[in-house]
Amino acid sequence: MPSRVAPAMVAVLGLAVALGAAPRCVADEAASPPRAGSPFKLPPAVAHKGAIASAYPLATEAGQEILAKGGNAFDAAVAVSAALAVVEPSSSGLGGGGFYLLHRQSDGYETMLDAREKAPAAATRDMYLDKAGNPIPNASTDGSLAAAIPGEPAAFEYLARKYGKLPLKVSLQPAIRIAREGFSMYPRLLGSLRYKRDRMLKSPDTAKVFLTPDGNVPELGYIIKEPDLANTLEAIANEGAKGFYGGRIAQELVDGVRATGGIWTLADLASYKVIERKPLVGDYHGARIVSASPPSSGGVAVLDALNILSGFDLQAVDSGTRKHLVIEAMRRAYRDRALYLGDPDFVSMPLAQLINPDYAAGQRSSIRADKAMPSDMLPGIESQPVGMQTTHFSVLDSEGNLVAGTISLNLFFGIGYIPPKTGVLLNNTMDDFSIKPGTPNAFGLVGNAANAIAPNKRSLSSMAPTFVETKKGLMIIGTPGGSYIISMVLLGTLDYMDGKSAADIVADGRYHHQYLPDVVDYEKGALAESELAQLRGMGHTLKEGDRRWGNMEVITWDYTSGKVQAASDPRGDGEGLVY
């Protein structure tokens, strides 16, 4: 069996790092030199079997197990996703969805699997507004009316059937085993359960799994078993996606949702389809950037910001000015996100313009190197919170195939409700629509008509699974963090371009500006006192966060030395393996 990377090593799948702590996993291995011929000039083989980084060791090891059985990166992505649904239920699951960025090395083919949740057919534009046209408090985050139709189970079958080498049944076995045998309560899960305990008490099936018989949050080390979820995974393993979107499981899901105020139908589930979309591709100082396309806004915003920054020499300015310029690029990229983006199957978007260097030059011309521009001075929309409520993983296999997967339930544990006999926690992704133009969602993001609710529509997301390649090497990067994802991936990309290691990229301090509210959020210790003073002097409003952000998972590959590193964010509990 391949050896496990020591806890001091860096991991490949999207884990998050705690400030002041070392990355939880760092692995270094050598690979053969790069070759030409595909968009990524990857060598035909990677050292050993590959690399994986994810938010929890059991999920990373599930992917490793599948690679060891002859699977490729796409099979491993199924195994890791399914295992995360079991062991990290606060952040993703069968009741959620997400995006999978893929690179197939044999022919250089790149694609993004859109497994984002979609609105039920009975959804309406004003479903969360009262008679006066004002948002009903918590209507889009609490209760079954907030749940969109899940996409993750469909992604499992799609990945295995179209891109994998192993039967779906094989790739799901690690997750099924963990769900039946159980896993130990760990600190981050314990903390999120304390946060959602009252919500879980309202759902008997949720409380049965995650709370003690007397309704309390379990102690560390308590064994959590999920037999109903194991049965649902077995149904998918045996029947494919129809084991979830049809038959008994589908009926149980619909009955449970409708009994608690939701509007799902069997037709909603039966009609769900994964959509392949062309990834966005950009250039930053000679690096090839590949990232998610709408309905994810992450790739657009990251490329928009990088294009703006490409006209500055960030190495030639002091650290405070550098951070000011990055903040101003964030401000403008998030403005464009709010104004223009939505589901490409429903709205027309100026994507070519938004990632065009000429457009970025116009944006850049409004930036002063010595002064912040208030967001209300940018043409925009009227208007007036951060987390780990998503998860990310990265995979590199021995053939050179790549996967960056970001998946979610939206907020912690979604709506906190498990329909009886399913084991499936449901999402509250309907909150990611623009409930009313200018009204912020749970992450403080505002939106416009392009992201308004419509039947069968997919809401905008900030997820940004990304590949970065230079002449010297490659990085796979992604992270959870709601609206902060874009800022974190941007900062990680800049770090990689500066030559930082995978360990340093996941561990670096983070700061963020999202256009509205007009505030620079930063992690404790991320900005030096001199930088804080300089930024305040430029007119920025600064706010120190009360907790750390994200759970970044990074894999890097140095073409010159052949070294592969997998780094898992020390802010989380994950693990990176190179073997």
Predicted feature residues:
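Bacterial N-terminal signal peptides
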Residues: 9-20
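Noncatalytic scaffold domains of N-terminal-nucleophile
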Residues: 28-61, 65, 73-240, 244-246, ...
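Internal maturation/activation junctions in enzymes
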Residues: 312-409, 421-422, 437, 446, ...
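Short, small/polar residue-rich loop motifs at catalytic or cofactor-binding pockets
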Residues: 276, 387-390, 412, 461-463, ...
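Extended C-terminal subregions enriched in glycine
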Residues: 457, 489, 497-547
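Short beta-strand scaffold segments in enzyme catalytic cores
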Residues: 92, 97-104, 391-395, 465-468, ...
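Active-site rim segments in enzyme catalytic domains, especially the processed small/beta chain
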Residues: 86-93, 97-112, 263-265, 402-471
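Bacterial N-terminal signal peptides that target proteins for export
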Residues: 1-11
